[in-house]
Amino acid sequence: MKILVLGATGRTGRLFIHKALEEGHSVTAYVRNPDKARALLGTHPNLTITPGDLNDTERLAAASAGQDVMASLLGQKATVREFLHSTFLQERLPLIMQTVTGAGVKRCVLLSAYGVGDTVRTASLPMRLVCKVIMHGIFTDKVKADALVAEYQPYISRAHPGR
């Protein structure tokens, strides 16, 4: 399978890529900083590191061409500002989805978090407080971004790890 990974140099992205390569998949890591990506990800015959910005639709479309799956493992930096208010995914995810599906990608996996959307109902009281108070900005951004890309069903699968 050919997999395009966004958020490749983050902790989850690195783990995902190493597992995908271990299982024999071809991976394209779309990254802002190729030198950083090479240092973090190393080299592998099935790994392609493609430089680009999430707002550069032409470059993202070119990286998406021929891919079977796009895995968005994007996340916000854990800063006080992001915890209080974030629009990172709301601003980027609709454009990303339009671009990659327009380039022919048929399946998109979006990393979310346990406590976002319907999953908050199954969380313990302390976890719900964390979701609603401490992580409010980041989780609100994820919920709003999900709503903005809902039109792309059935292309989207969401992962809510952490339970």
List where the protein language model places each region.
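N-terminal Rossmann NAD(P)H-binding glycine-rich loop of SDR-like oxidoreductase domains
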Residues: I3-H25
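Conserved hydrophobic beta-strands of the Rossmann-like cofactor-binding core
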Residues: I3-V5, M70, C108
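Conserved beta-strand segments of alpha/beta enzyme cores
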Residues: S26, N46-T48, Y155-S157
